[in-house]
């Protein structure tokens, strides 16, 4: 069923860009600036849209790729003078949230999981192994307050 708006020659078009999955520099099925660039460009240019909608369902991932994608969206929105609306489905955490804040407005379901940027950082601890091998951590700084740790050595 078509919606008709009186006095408009053409019904406004809203481009929809689905951003679903993990954000990472490479790999199939992952969001990154290189693979998304043509789709983002198309969303802002094809058919002269009145707005762009981002449908986001991402737990996040690479901070660099999140920044590049968000910057591309914001740059095109500003250049084309188009509003951007983010609609969060299940999750927009960490880098997914970063993508959402590139929009002018964010819409979420009460059941959506919304997370902060930098929620999780994972790594491996090998301090005991390193001590057994005779290795120790050394940090050198040249200014009094450069390092936040009182255990660090000052030069």
Language-model features: where?
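STAS-typified acidic loop motif
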Residues: 10-34
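A short, well-ordered alpha-helical element
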Residues: 27-50
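Hydrophobic alpha-helical segments that mediate membrane insertion or helix-helix packing
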Residues: 54, 99-100, 146
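Glycine-rich beta-to-alpha active-site loop
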Residues: 58-60, 76-124, 130
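Conserved small/polar residues in nucleotide/adenosyl-binding loops
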Residues: 142-150
């Amino acid at each position: 069923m078509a919606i008709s708006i009186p006095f408009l020659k053409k019904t406004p078009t809203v481009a929809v860009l689905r951003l679903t999955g993990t954000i990472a520099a490479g790999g199939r099925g992952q969001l990154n600036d290189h693979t998304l660039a043509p789709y983002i460009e198309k969303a802002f240019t094809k058919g002269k849209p009145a707005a762009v909608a981002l449908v986001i369902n991402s737990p996040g991932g690479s901070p660099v790729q999140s920044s590049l994608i968000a910057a591309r969206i914001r740059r095109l929105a500003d250049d084309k003078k188009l509003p951007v609306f983010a609609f969060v489905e299940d999750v927009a955490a960490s880098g997914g949230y970063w993508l959402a804040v590139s929009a002018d407005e964010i819409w979420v379901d009460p059941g959506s999981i919304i997370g902060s940027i930098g929620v999780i950082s994972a790594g491996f601890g090998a301090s005991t192994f390193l001590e057994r091998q005779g290795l120790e951590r050394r940090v050198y700084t040249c200014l009094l307050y450069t390092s936040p740790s009182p255990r660090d050595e000052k030069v």
